[in-house]
Design a protein with these regions (language model features):
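Surface-exposed, charge/polar-rich loops and edge strands
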Residues: 1-203
Length: 203
């Protein structure tokens, strides 16, 4: 018997069922359909940030002004991006950067690269305050090839793309242990189950 589980995917569905049962005063003895697996069988990928309608950012000036370590890279050389690094792609080039070490004063969400990039660079450089509701930002799943993202930029379909590192299971676990919430579109979970259409009647 397991005392508790971490929900890797489908939080909104679990929350919706929980809210319904609480408001209706009913108890579902059968629970809800779920798949339980070991964390070693779970693959966590990132979601990348696509920025449009802001104009091409001068990332080098921003990095220099804010003492952010970065380097220019060529996609043809298949650059390696470490787990504590991110990449920003513009029509002028591709840059790998690091925001440096986190501090013990930060909570688990504040330590995430996605949080630091959204609250720092995307807000400070692009002027996007709310990444959940701003039409200028969209998201692309983490297994998208870098060349495809660069092609989107070269076609003029967006201003830049922030290529984010995937969060580790330990990071996701730490967020849950602190009773916090992962930022929207910060994890792409695999495997995706091919279950077809499944319905469960609660009423």
């Amino acid at each position: 018997m397991l005392d508790s589980l971490y929900i890797a995917d489908g939080h909104h569905r679990v929350a919706a069922v929980t809210q319904y049962l609480q408001e209706s005063g009913k108890v579902n003895q059968h629970g809800l359909m779920s798949l339980v697996m070991d964390q070693d069988d779970l693959l966590i990928k990132s979601f990348h940030r696509i920025i449009s309608g802001c104009g091409e950012p001068n990332v080098e000036v921003y990095f220099n002004d804010n003492n952010i370590a970065y380097r220019s890279v060529s996609l043809a050389e298949q650059p390696t991006v470490q787990s504590n690094e991110s990449m920003v792609m513009t029509s002028s080039g591709c840059f790998v950067f690091s925001l440096g070490e986190t501090t013990t004063a930060m909570n688990a969400v504040e330590k995430l690269e996605v949080t630091r990039i959204e609250s720092g660079i995307i807000r400070g450089l692009m002027g996007i305050e709310n990444t959940s509701h701003d039409a200028r930002i969209s998201f692309m799943r983490g297994d998208t090839p870098l060349q495809k993202m660069k092609w989107i930029i070269d076609q003029g379909e967006c201003d830049c793309v922030f290529v984010l590192p995937a969060n580790s299971f330990d990071q996701v676990e730490a967020v849950a242990d602190q009773n916090l919430t992962m930022p929207p579109k910060s994890t792409w979970i695999e495997p995706k189950l091919l279950t077809g259409f499944v319905s469960q009647q609660f009423d």
